[in-house]
């Protein structure tokens, strides 16, 4: 059962785009996420992070990280007392598991976490986010992530059909 070769295509980036001037498609997706967030408490609650808890813990420990930014955190329930509503696979919030002194949550689609972070963090994690960023905006989003980090970045980019249907 040989798989057919993967069709590769060059991505179309637009170097003129930035946080201050993103593509219209990016702006529309953020608005779509805001609507989806408000429709259900369980929507984008951070559950995709659960399966990476151990590996992130290993990287955070190895790199002696004490501060962390979750870029595209959704509601970020795994960092709060609501962690148990998301998963029974962990017994405390992930920031406690990872031994962090501080953490910051950022998600432009969720008003509670939509304020742009400032400063640097030892670690930046982003799970199941980048596959939704329009290709034209990828460079500035990746630059933004890299400008927040001092020690390590953990990116998980889903390469399978999404469970949620978005306009992207």
Protein language model features and the residues they cover:
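Conserved N-terminal segment of class I S-adenosyl-L-methionine
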Residues: 1-120, 139-142, 159, 163, ...
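Short, structured coil segments at secondary-structure junctions
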Residues: 99, 148-149
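A conserved beta-strand element that flanks and buttresses the S-adenosyl-L-methionine
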Residues: 125
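Short glycine-rich, flexible loops that bind phosphorylated cofactors or substrates
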Residues: 132-133, 162
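A short, conserved alpha-helix within the catalytic core of class I
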Residues: 133-144, 148
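Conserved beta-strand signature within the Rossmann-like core of class I S-adenosyl-L-methionine
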Residues: 149-160
């Amino acid at each position: 059962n040989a798989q057919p070769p993967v069709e590769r295509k060059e991505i179309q980036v637009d170097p003129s785009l930035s946080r201050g001037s993103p593509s219209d498609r990016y702006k529309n997706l953020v608005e779509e996420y805001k609507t989806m967030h408000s429709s259900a408490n369980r929507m984008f609650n951070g559950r995709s992070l659960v399966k990476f808890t151990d590996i992130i813990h290993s990287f955070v420990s190895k790199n002696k990280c004490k501060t962390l930014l979750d870029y595209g955190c959704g509601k970020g329930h795994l960092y709060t007392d609501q962690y148990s509503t998301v998963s029974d696979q962990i017994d405390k919030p992930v920031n406690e598991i990872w031994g962090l002194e501080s953490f910051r949550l950022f998600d432009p689609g969720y008003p509670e976490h939509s304020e742009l972070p400032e400063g640097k963090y030892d670690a930046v994690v982003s799970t199941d986010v980048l596959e939704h960023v329009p290709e034209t905006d990828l460079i500035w989003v990746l630059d933004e992530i890299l400008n927040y980090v001092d020690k390590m970045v953990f990116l998980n980019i889903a390469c399978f059909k999404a469970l949620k249907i978005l306009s992207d």
